[in-house]
Amino acid sequence: MGIIDVQRSHLTATPSKERDAPAHPPPTILPVCILFPYTSIALPVLMYYIPEKGQFDQNPFLKLIAILPPCLYSAVRFPLLFLGNPESSCTPRPALYATLYLLLDASLLAFSAISILSIAAFTTTEWNSDEVVAVCSTLLPSLLVLPAHLLSTSCALTPGSIGFTDSSVDILIDLLMVSLLAAGLTLNVDESWRFFPYICISSLVLVLAKLLRKSSSMPRRDPAPAPAWRIAAFVLIFGLSMFVYFSILYECLLIFGNHFPWFPSQAPSNDLTNKW
């Protein structure tokens, strides 16, 4: 009987230990979590400073180097967030909560689709001015990487505990990232493209600081139900992300409308410095 009791206690104790153990990212997605956000901003900003501005239309490969990394990071990161939240599909929830989580999942997949669409749009358009080069190689990477990075490292999307999760110094870093997103959108409306490289370089520094903080801290557990201010912070980040991505979608539709007469879009020009 003693052996049987020991075996039973072992079998019942093992699942609780597994549940209590912090979740580590699978090795297959570590490059996405660590390398992608940094290189997705660093490579495009190098493309802004190294080649001559007129070489982009002569060599489409330079366009691809500037556009592909941030779009690919965003296109991959959001499906990983969607797939990493299996409880949303198997845990019974009230109808209102189920609808909200369905909209959340649909938005994540829409962000990924917009990122893929951006690859075709921004490599198709002509980079015929310094303004367009600045938008595509400095502003666009920040607008694509920062929302994906914030939602994946600073927010919990688990049903019942959805909210903002960072604390201490990370809150300041996140606040600066949100400020950069708002500043980038505002400067684009004001056509102040000369400030775009500063937005990009600042984003690069903040992403690197966040990666160093995350690599030296303990893995995050699933949090308890978040207080109201953390939910409000998540709503702010997610709402700003929606505005950013649907602004990019609008610009993609304008580009396609300029290149394809049959496309249902009316755009006055293909100058990317028009208001998004």
UniProtKB/Swiss-Prot annotation:
InterPro entries reported for this sequence: UPF0328
Lineage of the species this protein comes from: Eukaryota, Fungi, Fungi incertae sedis, Microsporidia, Unikaryonidae
Which Pfam families does this chain map to? DUF2463
Region Disordered, annotated ranges = 1-24
> What's the name of the protein?
UPF0328 protein ECU04_0100
Give the family per the record: Belongs to the UPF0328 family.
Tell me the organism.
Answer: Encephalitozoon cuniculi (strain GB-M1) (Microsporidian parasite)
Superkingdom in the source lineage: Eukaryota
